[in-house]
């Protein structure tokens, strides 16, 4: 298994402006990975606009409603590392196909639940299917694209969660108003099954050995784990970036989950109208996700470490705007405009932090490194925001909860500044390591050759 491409492969990569394989294959892989992430978050977030219906029918507390969102993130985070280890050893495309089928079937099963406990368990299985998808997808995209465009590509990829959340919130409200809230799960669960079949055509990359004599396909699991976690533990930048990303996502996930309910309770909107209004905020965040990935990457081309102070500044702006929006007294229209502006800034970290993480993680363990990031983001970020806001809401009211939560963005700003100190050292350690391309899984299956 080669660490450095041979002459023909290097020439092909050069002709394709640094892409690992042909640009057409790379963009097809990107499109398919983006599409699955899009439906991943439709399935994950469709429940948010259903909160008023579920609360009314089953008489749940805000904390219980928040837990229906948080349980997905907890399971995703807890299972991300094992799944990434399997993906780094056995292939990313195979792993992604299995994930997509699992979470799609689990989403469809939610429409048959009869009480809170059943829905909670079904949502946990949705998380089980989605476990590791983001990290494995990040590893695939990061390796296929050249480093110069990595942040922009990942910024675009990470627009998918926001766009999926937008459509999930809108569809949930619309379907619930016409056919009942349970039908929403059945409608959004089917497309993922179809996309899973097409994903078999995506071309993977060959797993790169951590050292020339450590082929991961042949060595023992114990030795593999020792080498992998030893490499990650030396990457201090990754750990601080994980902390910063998680803190910012507490703010993001709380806003995603509770804004429809806030508009319903405080501005008298119907659940359907509140879902559409909240979708505007999430959509602005989705567009800004791509924009920030491009802008930050462009401005820091010569000094990549400056991505981190840029993120720090953007997180501080996020906190100030949201605290002002929910902590002050305004006319409804003015408050909503402030919330939209906050939404423009709140997704600033999403694509950029993944790019920073991939800049400093060895290509042989990128799925696992991305899984560490995903673990922090899901367990300490996405899972915390909805349930923490729900608990604060039960105690002091939803408006006060949404005023306090954005202070987590200040913590994120501090962590990103600390991460800058070790970036150059960590990036230099892996600067000369490059992976090879692998054949598409569908081609492998058709010829009967092992990947």
Predicted regions and their residues:
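Juxtamembrane intracellular "pre-TM" segments in multi-pass secondary transporters
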Residues: 14-22, 206-241, 266, 438-441
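Cytoplasmic membrane-interface "Motif A"-like loop-to-helix N-cap segments
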Residues: 89-100, 298-314
């Amino acid at each position: 298994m080669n660490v450095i491409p041979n002459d023909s492969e290097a020439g092909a990569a050069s002709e394709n402006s640094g892409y690992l394989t042909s640009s057409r294959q790379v963009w097809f892989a990107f499109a398919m990975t983006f599409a699955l992430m899009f439906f991943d978050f439709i399935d994950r977030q469709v429940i948010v606009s259903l909160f008023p219906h579920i609360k009314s029918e089953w008489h749940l507390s805000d904390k219980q409603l928040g837990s229906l969102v948080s349980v997905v993130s907890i399971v995703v985070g807890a299972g991300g590392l094992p799944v990434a280890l399997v993906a780094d050893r056995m292939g990313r495309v195979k792993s992604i196909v299995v994930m997509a089928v699992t979470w799609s079937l689990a989403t469809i099963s939610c429409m048959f639940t009869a009480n809170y406990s059943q829905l909670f368990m079904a949502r946990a299985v949705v998380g089980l299917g989605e476990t590791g998808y983001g990290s494995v997808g990040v590893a695939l995209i990061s390796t296929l694209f050249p480093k110069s465009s990595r942040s922009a590509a990942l910024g675009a990829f990470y627009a998918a969660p926001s766009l999926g959340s937008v459509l999930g919130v809108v569809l949930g409200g619309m379907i619930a108003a016409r056919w009942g809230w349970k039908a929403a799960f059945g409608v959004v669960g089917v497309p993922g099954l179809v996309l899973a079949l097409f994903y078999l055509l995506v071309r993977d990359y060959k797993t790169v050995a951590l050292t020339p004599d450590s082929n991961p396909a042949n060595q023992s699991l114990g030795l593999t784990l020792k080498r992998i976690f030893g490499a990650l533990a030396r990457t201090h930048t990754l750990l601080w970036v994980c902390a910063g990303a998680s803190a910012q996502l507490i703010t993001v996930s709380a806003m995603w989950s509770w804004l429809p309910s806030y508009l319903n309770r405080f501005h008298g909107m119907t659940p359907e109208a509140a879902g559409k209004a909240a979708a505007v905020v999430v959509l602005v965040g989705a567009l800004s996700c791509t924009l920030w990935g491009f802008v930050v990457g462009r401005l820091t081309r010569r000094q990549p470490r400056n991505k981190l102070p840029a993120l720090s500044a953007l997180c501080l702006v996020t906190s100030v705007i949201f605290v002002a929006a929910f902590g002050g007294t305004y006319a409804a229209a003015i408050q909503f405009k402030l919330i939209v502006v906050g939404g423009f800034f709140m997704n600033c970290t999403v694509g950029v932090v993944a790019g920073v993480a991939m800049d400093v993680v060895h290509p042989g363990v990128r799925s696992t490194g991305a899984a560490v990031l995903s673990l922090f983001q899901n367990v300490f970020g996405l899972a915390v925001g909805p349930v923490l806001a729900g608990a604060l809401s039960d105690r002091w009211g939803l408006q006060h909860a949404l005023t306090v939560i954005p202070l987590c963005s200040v913590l994120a700003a501090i962590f990103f500044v600390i991460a800058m100190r070790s970036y150059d050292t960590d990036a230099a350690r892996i600067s000369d390591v490059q992976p090879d391309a692998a054949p598409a899984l569908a081609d492998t299956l058709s010829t009967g050759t092992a990947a």
